[in-house]
Amino acid sequence: RLCNVVFFSPEDLGIIKNGPSERRRFVDMELCQLDNFYLYNLNHYNKIVNQRNKLLKDMYMNPDLKETLTIWDMQLVSYGSKIIERRKLFVEQLNEIIYEIHKKLSGGREEIRIQYEPDVELDEFESKLRNSQDRDMRAKMTSVGPHRDDFSFLVGDVDIRTVSYTHLTLPTTSRV
């Protein structure tokens, strides 16, 4: 008879107590293992963000480069939109699984869920990126896109990022 084992370590709490980049990394690692298309889009998106950031830095010495920013923005929106769509779907699917598992573990006393908090909505991505160009040029970095997304972990309506870490059991449930 086989038994499923889930390893849980204190480092797993980093998904909750550390910053948004840790939560994005967790979701991205899971999605990259499940979906090669997501991996492809994420790799291209990250390369474009890096190229765009380099361009923003280079524009300080050569302002004429601003004309090429729109080309990078179009690619950023194209790959970034696919990332946003897939993350939304992944969180919806994960919530269905977590709900059933946690219901059995807790006897239905509480509901848990993950909430996806995209930095930008799909229908606003292009305009927000365009409107951020001047700010991005001053900061020399891209300030809009899925590389700024976050995820909340909710028990009932309480965001457990804001509660004592000694009471957290969500990472165990989400890894089952």
Identify what each model region corresponds to.
Residues 1-3, 22-27, 43-51, 77-81, ...:
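Short charge-dense sequence patches
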Residues 1-22, 27-38, 95-100, 128-134:
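Nucleotide-state sensing region of NTPase/ATPase domains
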Residues 3, 31-38, 49, 56, ...:
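Conserved NTP-handling cores and scaffolds of large molecular machines
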Residues 60-168, 174:
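Conserved NTPase motor "head" modules and their coupling/switch loops across ABC/AAA+ ATPases, GTPases
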Residues 14-15, 21-67, 74:
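Long, charged N-terminal accessory/stalk domains
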Residues 1, 172-176:
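Compositionally biased non-globular segments, especially hydrophobic aliphatic-rich helices
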Residues 10, 14, 29-34, 55, ...:
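Alpha-helix C-capping/helix-to-loop hinge sites
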